Protein backbone atom coordinates (compact mmCIF):
# COMPACT_ATOMS: atom_id res chain seq x y z
CA UNK A 1 0.00 0.00 0.00
CA UNK A 2 1.47 3.34 -1.02
CA UNK A 3 1.86 5.87 1.75
CA UNK A 4 1.13 9.50 0.88
CA UNK A 5 2.79 12.22 2.92
CA UNK A 6 2.07 15.81 3.87
CA UNK A 7 5.08 17.74 5.13
CA UNK A 8 5.35 20.77 7.41
CA UNK A 9 8.61 21.77 9.06
CA UNK A 10 8.12 22.33 12.77
CA UNK A 11 10.79 25.03 13.14
CA UNK A 12 9.57 27.49 10.50
CA UNK A 13 8.53 30.64 12.40
CA UNK A 14 6.16 31.73 9.64
CA UNK A 15 4.18 28.52 10.13
CA UNK A 16 3.49 29.28 13.80
CA UNK A 17 0.42 31.02 15.13
CA UNK A 18 0.75 33.63 17.86
CA UNK A 19 -0.33 31.03 20.41
CA UNK A 20 2.53 28.80 19.30
CA UNK A 21 5.22 31.45 19.64
CA UNK A 22 7.82 31.42 22.41
CA UNK A 23 10.19 28.50 22.61
CA UNK A 24 9.29 27.18 19.16
CA UNK A 25 12.88 26.76 18.09
CA UNK A 26 15.06 24.17 19.75
CA UNK A 27 17.84 26.61 20.61
CA UNK A 28 15.34 28.93 22.25
CA UNK A 29 13.92 26.04 24.26
CA UNK A 30 17.32 25.01 25.54
CA UNK A 31 18.03 28.63 26.44
CA UNK A 32 14.93 28.67 28.63
CA UNK A 33 15.90 25.57 30.61
CA UNK A 34 16.45 26.73 34.22
CA UNK A 35 19.97 26.38 35.64
CA UNK A 36 21.07 23.40 37.71
CA UNK A 37 20.56 23.96 41.43
CA UNK A 38 22.54 22.84 44.44
CA UNK A 39 21.10 20.09 46.62
CA UNK A 40 20.31 22.65 49.33
CA UNK A 41 18.42 24.84 46.86
CA UNK A 42 16.51 21.86 45.51
CA UNK A 43 15.54 20.65 48.98
CA UNK A 44 14.32 24.13 49.93
CA UNK A 45 12.23 24.39 46.77
CA UNK A 46 10.75 20.93 47.20
CA UNK A 47 9.67 21.76 50.75
CA UNK A 48 8.11 25.01 49.54
CA UNK A 49 6.30 23.27 46.68
CA UNK A 50 4.86 20.64 49.02
CA UNK A 51 3.52 23.40 51.26
CA UNK A 52 2.06 25.34 48.33
CA UNK A 53 0.36 22.26 46.88
CA UNK A 54 -1.44 21.79 50.21
CA UNK A 55 -2.35 25.46 50.50
CA UNK A 56 -3.75 25.56 46.96
CA UNK A 57 -5.39 22.14 47.28
CA UNK A 58 -3.64 21.31 44.02
CA UNK A 59 -2.28 18.06 42.62
CA UNK A 60 0.87 17.63 40.53
CA UNK A 61 0.75 15.38 37.47
CA UNK A 62 4.06 14.80 35.71
CA UNK A 63 5.29 13.04 32.61
CA UNK A 64 8.01 10.39 32.65
CA UNK A 65 10.30 12.68 30.64
CA UNK A 66 10.46 15.62 33.07
CA UNK A 67 13.12 16.19 35.71
CA UNK A 68 13.49 13.41 38.29
CA UNK A 69 12.80 15.85 41.15
CA UNK A 70 9.40 16.66 39.65
CA UNK A 71 8.57 12.99 39.17
CA UNK A 72 9.45 12.26 42.79
CA UNK A 73 7.46 15.26 44.02
CA UNK A 74 4.37 14.14 42.15
CA UNK A 75 4.44 10.72 43.76
CA UNK A 76 5.39 12.00 47.22
CA UNK A 77 2.43 14.41 47.24
CA UNK A 78 -0.24 12.02 45.98
CA UNK A 79 -0.01 13.06 42.35
CA UNK A 80 0.73 11.03 39.24
CA UNK A 81 3.73 10.21 37.04
CA UNK A 82 2.62 8.70 33.75
CA UNK A 83 1.88 9.17 30.07
CA UNK A 84 -0.06 12.23 28.93
CA UNK A 85 -3.54 10.75 28.66
CA UNK A 86 -3.24 8.91 31.97
CA UNK A 87 -2.12 12.25 33.45
CA UNK A 88 -5.29 13.85 32.11
CA UNK A 89 -7.51 11.02 33.29
CA UNK A 90 -5.92 11.13 36.73
CA UNK A 91 -6.52 14.87 36.88
CA UNK A 92 -10.10 14.47 35.72
CA UNK A 93 -10.86 11.89 38.39
CA UNK A 94 -8.95 13.58 41.24
CA UNK A 95 -10.88 15.75 43.68
CA UNK A 96 -8.40 18.63 43.37
CA UNK A 97 -9.76 21.72 41.64
CA UNK A 98 -6.30 22.80 40.48
CA UNK A 99 -4.08 20.61 38.32
CA UNK A 100 -0.38 21.37 37.91
CA UNK A 101 0.79 19.68 34.71
CA UNK A 102 4.54 19.15 34.38
CA UNK A 103 5.02 18.27 30.74
CA UNK A 104 4.37 19.96 27.41
CA UNK A 105 1.51 22.14 26.29
CA UNK A 106 -0.69 19.57 24.55
CA UNK A 107 -0.76 17.60 27.81
CA UNK A 108 -2.10 20.63 29.65
CA UNK A 109 -4.67 21.16 26.91
CA UNK A 110 -5.84 17.56 27.06
CA UNK A 111 -6.16 17.83 30.84
CA UNK A 112 -8.26 20.97 30.41
CA UNK A 113 -10.44 19.36 27.73
CA UNK A 114 -11.21 16.44 30.03
CA UNK A 115 -11.58 18.70 33.10
CA UNK A 116 -12.97 22.00 31.77
CA UNK A 117 -14.22 23.04 35.20
CA UNK A 118 -10.73 22.80 36.75
CA UNK A 119 -7.84 25.24 36.77
CA UNK A 120 -4.87 23.80 34.87
CA UNK A 121 -1.46 25.41 35.39
CA UNK A 122 1.90 24.60 33.82
CA UNK A 123 5.44 25.59 34.87
CA UNK A 124 6.13 27.10 31.42
CA UNK A 125 3.52 27.66 28.72
CA UNK A 126 6.26 27.79 26.08
CA UNK A 127 6.97 24.09 26.65
CA UNK A 128 5.63 22.68 23.40
CA UNK A 129 6.21 19.60 21.21
CA UNK A 130 7.72 19.17 17.75
CA UNK A 131 4.80 16.93 16.74
CA UNK A 132 2.36 19.64 17.79
CA UNK A 133 4.36 22.42 16.11
CA UNK A 134 4.72 20.36 12.95
CA UNK A 135 0.95 20.14 12.54
CA UNK A 136 -0.39 23.74 12.49
CA UNK A 137 -4.21 23.81 12.87
CA UNK A 138 -4.90 25.92 9.78
CA UNK A 139 -2.66 23.81 7.54
CA UNK A 140 -4.16 20.66 8.99
CA UNK A 141 -7.72 21.90 8.49
CA UNK A 142 -6.96 22.64 4.84
CA UNK A 143 -5.46 19.17 4.45
CA UNK A 144 -8.61 17.61 5.94
CA UNK A 145 -10.84 19.74 3.72
CA UNK A 146 -8.93 18.52 0.66
CA UNK A 147 -9.69 14.90 1.56
CA UNK A 148 -13.28 14.80 2.85
CA UNK A 149 -13.60 11.10 2.03
CA UNK A 150 -11.06 10.11 4.68
CA UNK A 151 -11.56 9.36 8.37
CA UNK A 152 -9.29 11.67 10.35
CA UNK A 153 -7.19 9.93 13.01
CA UNK A 154 -4.76 11.97 15.10
CA UNK A 155 -2.17 11.03 17.68
CA UNK A 156 -2.46 12.39 21.23
CA UNK A 157 0.55 14.66 20.63
CA UNK A 158 -1.46 17.38 18.91
CA UNK A 159 -3.12 20.65 19.82
CA UNK A 160 -6.72 21.01 20.92
CA UNK A 161 -7.51 22.68 17.59
CA UNK A 162 -6.17 19.70 15.63
CA UNK A 163 -8.09 17.28 17.84
CA UNK A 164 -11.22 19.33 17.15
CA UNK A 165 -10.91 18.40 13.44
CA UNK A 166 -10.40 14.69 14.13
CA UNK A 167 -12.82 11.80 14.06
CA UNK A 168 -10.59 9.76 16.34
CA UNK A 169 -7.74 10.49 18.71
CA UNK A 170 -5.52 7.49 19.36
CA UNK A 171 -2.68 6.38 21.52
CA UNK A 172 -0.46 3.67 20.15
CA UNK A 173 -1.89 1.02 22.45
CA UNK A 174 -5.31 1.37 20.90
CA UNK A 175 -4.17 2.87 17.60
CA UNK A 176 -3.58 -0.49 15.95
CA UNK A 177 -6.99 -1.80 16.98
CA UNK A 178 -8.77 1.37 15.94
CA UNK A 179 -7.07 1.45 12.55
CA UNK A 180 -7.82 -2.26 12.09
CA UNK A 181 -11.45 -1.54 13.00
CA UNK A 182 -11.67 1.33 10.51
CA UNK A 183 -9.85 -0.64 7.81
CA UNK A 184 -12.28 -3.54 8.24
CA UNK A 185 -15.10 -1.08 7.63
CA UNK A 186 -13.46 0.00 4.38
CA UNK A 187 -12.47 3.41 5.72
CA UNK A 188 -9.61 5.35 4.19
CA UNK A 189 -7.59 7.18 6.83
CA UNK A 190 -5.97 10.58 7.09
CA UNK A 191 -3.30 10.17 9.78
CA UNK A 192 -1.40 12.85 11.70
CA UNK A 193 1.13 13.81 12.76
CA UNK A 194 3.86 11.21 13.52
CA UNK A 195 5.13 9.57 10.34
CA UNK A 196 7.07 6.82 12.11
CA UNK A 197 4.19 5.64 14.26
CA UNK A 198 1.83 6.00 11.31
CA UNK A 199 4.11 3.95 9.07
CA UNK A 200 4.39 1.24 11.70
CA UNK A 201 0.61 0.99 12.06
CA UNK A 202 0.11 1.09 8.28
CA UNK A 203 2.49 -1.82 7.80
CA UNK A 204 0.79 -3.82 10.54
CA UNK A 205 -2.73 -3.23 9.26
CA UNK A 206 -2.41 -2.69 5.50
CA UNK A 207 -4.78 0.25 5.83
CA UNK A 208 -4.98 3.02 3.22
CA UNK A 209 -3.36 5.88 5.16
CA UNK A 210 -2.70 9.38 3.86
CA UNK A 211 0.02 10.57 6.21
CA UNK A 212 1.14 13.90 7.54
CA UNK A 213 4.91 13.92 7.96
CA UNK A 214 5.60 14.97 11.50
CA UNK A 215 8.17 13.61 13.87
CA UNK A 216 9.29 13.78 17.46
CA UNK A 217 12.55 15.69 17.69
CA UNK A 218 13.93 13.25 20.25
CA UNK A 219 12.99 9.93 18.66
CA UNK A 220 13.71 11.02 15.09
CA UNK A 221 17.39 11.43 16.01
CA UNK A 222 18.02 7.81 16.99
CA UNK A 223 20.36 6.18 14.46
CA UNK A 224 19.92 2.64 13.15
CA UNK A 225 23.52 2.06 11.99
CA UNK A 226 25.01 3.29 15.25
CA UNK A 227 22.47 1.27 17.24
CA UNK A 228 23.61 -1.87 15.44
CA UNK A 229 27.22 -1.09 16.34
CA UNK A 230 26.29 -0.44 19.96
CA UNK A 231 24.44 -3.74 20.18
CA UNK A 232 27.56 -5.52 18.97
CA UNK A 233 29.37 -4.04 21.97
CA UNK A 234 26.59 -5.25 24.30
CA UNK A 235 25.42 -8.56 22.81
CA UNK A 236 23.39 -9.52 25.89
CA UNK A 237 21.49 -6.24 26.05
CA UNK A 238 17.84 -6.05 25.07
CA UNK A 239 16.80 -3.07 22.96
CA UNK A 240 13.76 -1.10 24.13
CA UNK A 241 12.33 1.24 21.49
CA UNK A 242 9.55 3.82 21.48
CA UNK A 243 7.48 3.56 18.25
CA UNK A 244 8.05 7.21 17.36
CA UNK A 245 11.57 6.14 16.37
CA UNK A 246 12.70 5.62 12.75
CA UNK A 247 12.04 2.30 11.06
CA UNK A 248 15.74 1.37 11.10
CA UNK A 249 15.67 1.60 14.89
CA UNK A 250 12.31 -0.10 15.43
CA UNK A 251 13.47 -3.01 13.26
CA UNK A 252 16.22 -3.81 15.79
CA UNK A 253 13.98 -3.70 18.85
CA UNK A 254 13.41 -6.56 21.23
CA UNK A 255 10.52 -4.58 22.66
CA UNK A 256 8.55 -1.78 21.01
CA UNK A 257 6.31 0.05 23.42
CA UNK A 258 5.24 3.16 25.24
CA UNK A 259 7.03 4.69 28.16
CA UNK A 260 4.94 2.63 30.58
CA UNK A 261 5.46 -0.58 28.67
CA UNK A 262 9.19 -0.02 28.33
CA UNK A 263 9.44 0.46 32.09
CA UNK A 264 7.46 -2.75 32.59
CA UNK A 265 9.79 -4.59 30.20
CA UNK A 266 12.88 -3.36 32.02
CA UNK A 267 11.41 -4.61 35.28
CA UNK A 268 10.09 -7.93 34.03
CA UNK A 269 12.69 -9.22 31.60
CA UNK A 270 15.63 -11.20 32.97
CA UNK A 271 18.23 -9.25 31.00
CA UNK A 272 20.63 -7.16 33.06
CA UNK A 273 21.44 -4.65 30.30
CA UNK A 274 19.09 -2.58 28.18
CA UNK A 275 19.67 -0.16 25.32
CA UNK A 276 16.90 2.43 25.49
CA UNK A 277 15.66 4.39 22.45
CA UNK A 278 13.44 7.01 23.99
CA UNK A 279 13.84 10.22 25.99
CA UNK A 280 16.43 9.67 28.71
CA UNK A 281 14.08 11.17 31.29
CA UNK A 282 12.56 7.70 31.49
CA UNK A 283 15.76 6.26 32.94
CA UNK A 284 14.86 7.60 36.41
CA UNK A 285 11.77 5.40 36.56
CA UNK A 286 13.52 2.46 34.93
CA UNK A 287 16.26 2.50 37.56
CA UNK A 288 13.66 2.66 40.30
CA UNK A 289 11.67 -0.20 38.76
CA UNK A 290 14.72 -2.36 38.05
CA UNK A 291 17.49 -1.56 40.53
CA UNK A 292 20.81 -3.15 39.70
CA UNK A 293 20.15 -3.30 35.98
CA UNK A 294 22.15 -1.20 33.51
CA UNK A 295 20.51 1.18 31.06
CA UNK A 296 22.38 2.52 28.03
CA UNK A 297 21.08 5.38 25.91
CA UNK A 298 20.61 4.53 22.24
CA UNK A 299 22.82 6.66 19.95
CA UNK A 300 21.46 9.90 18.52
CA UNK A 301 24.50 10.95 16.49
CA UNK A 302 26.87 9.09 14.22
CA UNK A 303 29.94 9.98 12.20
CA UNK A 304 29.84 13.66 11.17
CA UNK A 305 26.37 13.94 12.72
CA UNK A 306 25.09 16.13 15.51
CA UNK A 307 21.98 15.93 17.64
CA UNK A 308 19.58 18.72 18.60
CA UNK A 309 17.93 16.91 21.47
CA UNK A 310 20.56 14.26 22.27
CA UNK A 311 17.88 11.97 23.73
CA UNK A 312 16.18 14.59 25.89
CA UNK A 313 13.29 16.84 24.92
CA UNK A 314 14.25 20.51 25.40
CA UNK A 315 10.64 21.44 26.06
CA UNK A 316 10.27 18.79 28.76
CA UNK A 317 13.52 20.12 30.25
CA UNK A 318 11.89 23.54 30.67
CA UNK A 319 9.88 22.13 33.58
CA UNK A 320 11.83 22.69 36.79
CA UNK A 321 11.48 23.22 40.53
CA UNK A 322 11.99 26.97 40.15
CA UNK A 323 9.15 27.68 37.72
CA UNK A 324 6.91 25.11 39.41
CA UNK A 325 7.24 26.96 42.71
CA UNK A 326 6.65 30.30 40.96
CA UNK A 327 3.46 29.06 39.30
CA UNK A 328 2.11 27.78 42.61
CA UNK A 329 2.87 31.11 44.26
CA UNK A 330 1.44 33.35 41.53
CA UNK A 331 -1.27 31.26 39.86
CA UNK A 332 0.11 32.29 36.47
CA UNK A 333 0.54 30.11 33.37
CA UNK A 334 -3.02 28.89 33.26
CA UNK A 335 -4.05 26.74 30.30
CA UNK A 336 -7.11 27.98 28.44
CA UNK A 337 -8.92 26.08 25.71
CA UNK A 338 -11.63 27.81 23.72
CA UNK A 339 -14.87 26.18 24.97
CA UNK A 340 -16.11 25.56 21.42
CA UNK A 341 -12.84 23.87 20.47
CA UNK A 342 -12.87 21.90 23.69
CA UNK A 343 -16.38 20.60 23.03
CA UNK A 344 -15.31 19.48 19.55
CA UNK A 345 -11.99 17.99 20.68
CA UNK A 346 -13.49 15.93 23.48
CA UNK A 347 -15.57 13.99 20.93
CA UNK A 348 -12.58 12.23 19.37
CA UNK A 349 -11.06 11.59 22.81
CA UNK A 350 -14.28 10.10 24.18
CA UNK A 351 -14.69 8.00 21.04
CA UNK A 352 -11.30 6.42 21.69
CA UNK A 353 -12.05 5.88 25.38
CA UNK A 354 -15.37 4.22 24.58
CA UNK A 355 -13.71 1.95 22.02
CA UNK A 356 -11.00 1.05 24.52
CA UNK A 357 -13.59 0.22 27.17
CA UNK A 358 -15.33 -2.11 24.74
CA UNK A 359 -12.02 -3.74 23.97
CA UNK A 360 -11.27 -3.92 27.69
CA UNK A 361 -7.94 -2.28 26.92
CA UNK A 362 -5.83 -0.06 29.12
CA UNK A 363 -5.28 3.17 27.23
CA UNK A 364 -2.18 5.34 27.61
CA UNK A 365 -0.64 8.01 25.42
CA UNK A 366 2.75 8.41 23.85
CA UNK A 367 2.68 5.05 22.19
CA UNK A 368 1.46 2.12 24.27
CA UNK A 369 2.14 -0.41 21.53
CA UNK A 370 2.12 -4.17 21.79
CA UNK A 371 5.66 -5.45 21.48
CA UNK A 372 6.83 -6.99 18.25
CA UNK A 373 8.85 -9.72 19.92
CA UNK A 374 8.03 -12.78 21.99
CA UNK A 375 10.23 -11.40 24.75
CA UNK A 376 7.38 -9.14 25.72
CA UNK A 377 4.62 -11.73 25.75
CA UNK A 378 3.03 -12.09 29.15
CA UNK A 379 3.88 -8.55 30.21
CA UNK A 380 0.62 -6.74 30.73
CA UNK A 381 -0.11 -3.09 30.09
CA UNK A 382 1.66 -0.77 32.51
UniProtKB/Swiss-Prot annotation:
Gene3D superfamilies: NadA-like. [4Fe-4S] cluster binds at residues 129, 216, 313. The keyword Transferase applies. Pathway: Cofactor biosynthesis; NAD(+) biosynthesis; quinolinate from iminoaspartate: step 1/1. It is found in: Cytoplasm. Catalyzes the condensation of iminoaspartate with dihydroxyacetone phosphate to form quinolinate. This is Quinolinate synthase. One of its GO terms (molecular function) is quinolinate synthetase A activity.
